[in-house]
Amino acid sequence: MIKKLSIQPASGLQGDLSVPGDKSVSHRGLILGAISQGTTTLHHFLPAADCLSTLTALQKLGVPIKRVDTTVTISGRGLRGLTQPQQPLDMGNAGTATRLLTGLLAGQPFETTLVGDTSLSQRPMERVRQPLQAMGAQVQLTAGHLPMTITGRTLHGSRTEMQVASAQVKSALILAALQADQASTIIEKLPTRDHTERLLQQFGGQIETAPDQRTITVQPQPALVGQSLTIPGDFSSAAFFVTAATIIPNSHVRLTNVGLNPTRTGFLNILRRMGGQVTVDHEHRMGEPVGTLDVRFAQLHPVQVTATEIPAVIDELPLVALLAATANGISTISGAAELRVKETDRIATIVTELQKLGVRITSQPDGFVIDGRKSWRQPTEPLASHGDHRIGMMMAIAALRLAAPAELESAEAVNISYPTFFEDLARLSQGV
């Protein structure tokens, strides 16, 4: 397992790349396949640590699942067919799976305990416990965190006004609502990624989103039906190469079959406002909108990103910071306090790591201010992922722009979401 890598400067990125399957869709496809009737096949599944934690947890809940490389076959057990695991479910670092399974297990007729690694055990779970409790669920936390014990009970339809803009919490409530005694309504604070809603409709679920894109009604579901799905390429993974091609001169990269769900692509809107050279072509559908991203090097302008944009760019905010660090002025990102409760306090880790390069960046309670006009310098200490996959990949991209090689510590963190990241980066840059 990699611990430390030396990353060489790149004179330009060139080539075509198909990124791995979408992490969010892989999690959700596994879960919906598990509670459907019949067989579900997932093609282009993401075999990263987080998704494998979900797969293993479902197997321990009695779901027969077979995986061959990126193809997964699930023998669905139906909505009421899960069985009590023999021991606590170890969710590793998988925050998405933990919150989604909490909603699912809240209506199952047995008790389950979920545990996780050090990082996951520090992430807030009260946000999912409270609305589930209002539906009649019994969820016991440890000081607001994992370990968490869920005692399945009869759930009641409810009307929930969400206090945080979180697709994970919304999805937990949707999975609980499928098992309730009557319809449930979920009102989002801001629209968030809608993979669960789209997939649930494909599996035969009755779910409706109002024109305001914030009000969701879920009907109790007697049965879902297994599907054959091809998972699109992960937009968040593609965004690393979009960023690299944008900030490294002499770059031209094409990224194929990338998922372009509009609730995920806020990053492209921000990049274009900054003067980025990215176009979309070969658009089609694979259950979700998909297309090819064509990206070239560009000189960037500063940008202001505010709270209403955050849900559609939450995973790409480290990259927005990196782009801003090359822009010809002062950029501000605000309304992003959610970054503080990700795998790390990402506001703190972004500031720490970019300051190693001499970037003028200061933290705010809910974001940061970045002046990109100062030239970068060679770091005097190793760059670090802090065990956070997105910080590790961000700094690997940043290192390509330096004048001399740089070391990246804890590089293995990329396995959480993108195990082949460094191989793909090397193909395009010859820089690792």
From Swiss-Prot:
GO terms for biological process: amino acid biosynthetic process; aromatic amino acid family biosynthetic process; chorismate biosynthetic process. Disulfide bonds: none annotated. The active site is at D315. Keywords: Amino-acid biosynthesis, Aromatic amino acid biosynthesis, Cytoplasm, Transferase. Transmembrane segments: none annotated. It catalyses: 3-phosphoshikimate + phosphoenolpyruvate = 5-O-(1-carboxyvinyl)-3-phosphoshikimate + phosphate. It is found in: Cytoplasm. One of its GO terms (molecular function) is 3-phosphoshikimate 1-carboxyvinyltransferase activity. Pathway: Metabolic intermediate biosynthesis; chorismate biosynthesis; chorismate from D-erythrose 4-phosphate and phosphoenolpyruvate: step 6/7. Phosphoenolpyruvate binds at K23, G95, R123, Q168, R346, R390. SUPFAM superfamilies: EPT/RTPC-like. The keyword Amino-acid biosynthesis applies. One of its GO terms (cellular component) is cytoplasm. 3-phosphoshikimate binds at K23, S24, R28, S166, Q168, D315, K342. Its EC number is 2.5.1.19. It comes from the Bacteria. The keyword Transferase applies. Belongs to the EPSP synthase family. HAMAP family: EPSP_synth. Monomer. Catalyzes the transfer of the enolpyruvyl moiety of phosphoenolpyruvate (PEP) to the 5-hydroxyl of shikimate-3-phosphate (S3P) to produce enolpyruvyl shikimate-3-phosphate and inorganic phosphate. This is 3-phosphoshikimate 1-carboxyvinyltransferase.
